Amino acid sequence: MLEQECYINTDDELHHDNIKQVESLYKVLEDMVFAVIKDSIKMDCENLLDQAVQAILEQEKENNRCISDIKANNPARPRKWKQKWISTVKESVDDRLKELPKDETNNSSSSLSQSFTNLGKIFKKDLTHIVNHLKQHYPDDFDVCNSYAQHYHQAFLAHTSTITEFELGDKDTFFLLCWVHNIYPNDILKDPSLAGHIDEARLKCLLPAQKIRDYESNYVSSEVLTVKSWINKSLDLEAQFWNVGKEPEKLDEAYHTELHIDVLQNFNGGVRRAMEISERLTNRLKPLLAAELVEFAKRYKSLFEEYLEKNKNQQYLWPIIIVNVNCCWNFRDFVTQNFNDAQLQRHKENMNSILLELEDLGYTVLLQNLFQDLKVTKKLAFYSIHIDSLMDQLLHSF
């Protein structure tokens, strides 16, 4: 009412003084209201916040009255407190982000992951606070959760854009894809405390589609090469052990090799890492890794065949053959149980075929040595059901 009276007649000096006083009071009130709004993101000031929001609503109501009243002559209206609320929300978010700890590590990969982790933590913490302590004080049309979320999201966009201006190594590429596909959308936006409060459809994707495709292609190529390198190193070490001619290690009184364990751990590790990014990328990577297992099996067979040809009189030939046949069984068990998807059937068949051929190489040498002293004159049917059954029994006895 005082404001209305001041602006009814502005000709005399008294009214000018009154207007100054009124505007001065409004400025004090405005500063107090938006100080509360700004601090509310990190403080428990619900009573003050309730009063501040009510003050904004009152000003919006008075703005609308002045707009609808053609007789109203108030140049101070509209006061635009609602617009200032939006800018204050952004300012409060910006201030919160300035409080993030500075990275002190010299490791670029650690720096990238830590910077995103810090952003994610403050996003989840602050949005949870907004849901639990601020949202109920605002009318629905303020859309308070999405308003705050948009500004945090802009910070993510800016940070991601800055990061991708530089060439990323394999670890950074992996982490960035994990963040874009999994951590941010699932662990943060879909966190139970935030579920239903943030409209994800209104949040722009953190990376352009083409950049995502490029990073995914780089990641897949790198992962395939990494797994290929490690499984072949394992095979090379195993082949060196054969040629040295030492007795294989025993586990529970049985000859034992770690080859299948090392190889399958590397294969599963590649699949597991892809799952940390997305199921879609896993489905893309898994057939490529399966193809590398097939190539591994071919090389395994070739090296084993070469070993048998060069070491026919080696002291521990039999135990080495036995551990490799057992190793093949473990590989075949794995592909039988895990390569059941349609896209893996061809690799499953190829893998089993190669492994069976490798086993037969071992069976042949074992049978030749076994029956040599018996002076068997007629040609043996090495691959008959009877012989296979006999070989299985012999192998299980070691």
Task: Label each PLM-derived region with a short phrase.
Residues 210-398:
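Extended alpha-helical rod/solenoid/coiled-coil scaffold segments used as assembly/tethering elements
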Residues 1-244:
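Extended, noncatalytic alpha-helical scaffold/tether regions
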